[in-house]
Swiss-Prot record:
Name by which UniProt lists this protein: ATP synthase gamma chain
Gene: atpG
Family: Belongs to the ATPase gamma chain family.
Lineage: Bacteria, Pseudomonadati, Verrucomicrobiota, Methylacidiphilae, Methylacidiphilales
Predominant subcellular localization, coarse grouping: membrane
Subunit structure: F-type ATPases have 2 components, CF(1) - the catalytic core - and CF(0) - the membrane proton channel. CF(1) has five subunits: alpha(3), beta(3), gamma(1), delta(1), epsilon(1). CF(0) has three main subunits: a, b and c.
Organism from which the protein derives: Methylacidiphilum infernorum (isolate V4)
């Protein structure tokens, strides 16, 4: 059995750890509330925007836009959104597992977040070339303008036919306890995808009534289709941030509770060891007195 000194040292160490995890839990909870609010508030706009674009397509005549044009996929670029920091449970592991399931030699990658960048930078193509094309900085307060920079980078690759498809991989926020790894294609834009609604995750958007468009539907689509890609990227980043802070808050809460449970066990062990030590001393004194007559 460990000595009382060793047990006291372990108790001090665990108390210090519990204080740290509790502080991290509180910080993560504060960030989680802000990130969740941003992610959830963006969903009705995303749903409504899908309806607007869908209502434009029938009025656009025979418009042929590269972002609507399906073509044989020789190269695909995947934008992967992870985290800069760890201590968020299996969030990054689950996402990377999802990427591994879809990985192909014709894939190229763009990353956001150090954890996924470190993994993707080690991937090599069939000729030994690096598959990671670029890395973008992850920020808690990332703006739509910054998300557009990423969208422009990806769309330029697509329009110049350096790639034939764009996909995104991120952790979709469901609730503080559930974050779902998502891998989906966002270009070429599927007309079927445009009318899907995120009913389970967001409040229903108001129905879009028929419009007379000015300028023409064709001109509007020319501008709105790239904007659609930008918004997909922005919403995915917001979801991933909400998932990250939720997962970290839950992980730190669990660590704090485990530390408290361990402290209780150690306190019992300490009291037992101390009681045995006192009993032993009493026996030694009694034995000495008996020997002295």
């Amino acid at each position: 059995m460990a000595t009382t000194r060793e047990i006291r040292r372990r108790i001090r160490s665990i108390k210090n750890t519990a204080q740290i995890t509790k502080a991290m839990q509180m910080v993560a909870a504060s960030k989680m509330r802000k990130a969740q609010q941003r992610a959830i508030e963006g969903r009705p706009y995303h749903s409504l925007f899908q309806e607007i674009v869908h209502s434009l397509i029938p009025q656009a005549g025979q418009l042929i836009h590269p972002l609507l044009e399906a073509r044989a996929i020789q190269k695909e670029i995947v934008f992967v959104i992870g985290t800069d920091k760890g201590l968020c449970g299996p969030l990054n592991t689950n996402l990377l597992r999802e990427i591994y399931k879809h990985h192909s030699p014709n894939h190229l990658y763009v990353s956001m977040g150090k954890k996924v960048r470190n993994y993707l930078s080690g991937l090599k193509g069939s000729r030994g070339e690096n598959l990671l094309l670029a890395d973008f900085e992850l920020k808690d307060n990332l703006t739509f303008r910054e998300a557009k920079r990423i969208g422009h980078f990806l769309i330029e690759k697509y329009l110049h036919k350096e790639i034939d498809a764009i996909s995104i991989a991120y952790s979709h926020f469901v609730n503080p306890l559930i974050q779902k790894p998502i891998y989906r294609r966002i270009a070429p834009i599927s007309k079927v995808e445009l009318v899907k609604k995120e009913k389970a995750e967001s409040p229903p958007a108001e129905s879009v009534l028929p419009f007379n468009f000015e300028p023409s539907a064709e001109e509007l689509l020319e501008s709105l289709l790239p904007f659609y890609i930008h918004w997909e990227i922005y919403q995915a980043i917001l979801d991933n941030l909400a998932s990250e802070h939720s997962a970290r808050m839950v992980a730190m809460k669990s660590a704090t509770e485990n530390a408290k449970s361990l402290l209780q066990d150690l306190s019992l062990e300490y009291n037992k060891a101390r009681q045995e030590s006192i009993t032993k001393e009493i026996l030694e004194i009694s034995t000495a007195q008996y020997a002295m007559g």
